[in-house]
Amino acid sequence: MKVRNSLKSLRSRHRDNRLVRRKGRIYVINKVQRRFKARQG
């Protein structure tokens, strides 16, 4: 999982990326291509 300041650019890299908020953190998850996982640091 990558830790990035801005997730908007990561989300636009694949059309199946989802922006999810869990426990006060923001994540990008992708069920199809799992390598696009990221968390906002």
UniProtKB/Swiss-Prot annotation:
GO terms for cellular component: ribonucleoprotein complex; ribosome. The gene is rpmJ. Keywords: Ribonucleoprotein, Ribosomal protein. It comes from the Bacteria. It comes from Rhodopseudomonas palustris (strain BisB5). This is Large ribosomal subunit protein bL36. GO terms for molecular function: structural constituent of ribosome. InterPro entries: Ribosomal_bL36 (IPR000473), Ribosomal_bL36_sp (IPR035977), Ribosomal_L36_bact (IPR047621). One of its GO terms (biological process) is translation. Belongs to the bacterial ribosomal protein bL36 family.
